[in-house]
From Swiss-Prot:
Keywords: ATP-binding, Cytoplasm, DNA synthesis, Kinase, Metal-binding, Nucleotide-binding, Transferase, Zinc
Gene Ontology MF, one: ATP binding
Active site: 90
Catalytic activity field: thymidine + ATP = dTMP + ADP + H(+)
Species of origin: Metamycoplasma arthritidis (strain 158L3-1) (Mycoplasma arthritidis)
Subunit composition and interactions: Homotetramer.
Protein name: Thymidine kinase
Keyword ATP-binding: yes
Length: 194
């Protein structure tokens, strides 16, 4: 997984909803634990979809996690034990401070692995992930399957009429779509408004 991991680095796992980001992150956690590199696993307080105190993949794989409201609280947790890595799921719900914290932790020698959406439902850069991508040593961009045409999907299409950017949801609110089908869906939504 990593060649000569002996210094800090940042890895970002990104892609649309339903692409397996949490599953990929859980694989990284298992590898770290197998190698006796203890990870501090966290997620934002905002993410309560499947569990309040666990990362849960759609395949049902789970791992206990610490819940943080403020990403700077990670420094207090790091004092509790000899962690070698910091693993963050649903990182797009943290603010831009995450970029500074991740960079600082990597500079201090931690392996920082972050999973989150890089785009919102409008296909615009979302949260801190785009800036993390710029400073990451390793990037894994996953794809889902478009529910309309079954081609590779790179976007999360919002099916409901809500306009706020931060809308927690799952299959009822979102679906994976390719660029073409996403654009067609957005056009259809606009026509319904008229």
């Amino acid at each position: 997984m990593y060649k000569n991991f002996n210094e800090g680095m940042i890895e970002v796992i990104t892609g649309p909803m339903f692409s397996g980001k949490s599953e990929e992150l859980l694989k990284r956690i298992r590898t770290l634990e197998y190698a006796k590199l203890k990870p501090l696993v966290i997620k934002p307080e905002f993410d309560t979809r499947f569990s309040e105190n666990e990362i849960v993949s759609r395949a049902g794989v789970k791992h206990k996690t610490h819940i943080l409201k403020n990403i700077n609280d990670v420094y207090f947790l790091l004092q509790e034990d000899k962690y070698k890595a910091v693993v963050i799921d649903e990182a797009h719900w943290f603010n831009e401070e995450l970029v500074k914290v991740a960079d600082d932790l990597a500079n201090k020698g931690y392996l920082v692995i972050v999973a989150g959406l890089d785009q919102n439902y409008l296909r615009e850069p979302f949260g801190p992930i785009p800036n993390l991508l710029a400073i990451a040593e390793r990037v894994t961009k996953l794809q889902a399957i478009c529910v309309k045409c079954q081609h590779a999907a790179s976007t999360s299409f919002r099916k409901v009429a809500a306009s706020e950017i931060n809308l927690l949801g799952d299959f009822q609110e979102y679906e994976a779509r390719c660029r073409k089908c996403h654009n067609a869906g957005q056009k259809e939504k606009l026509q319904k408004k008229v």
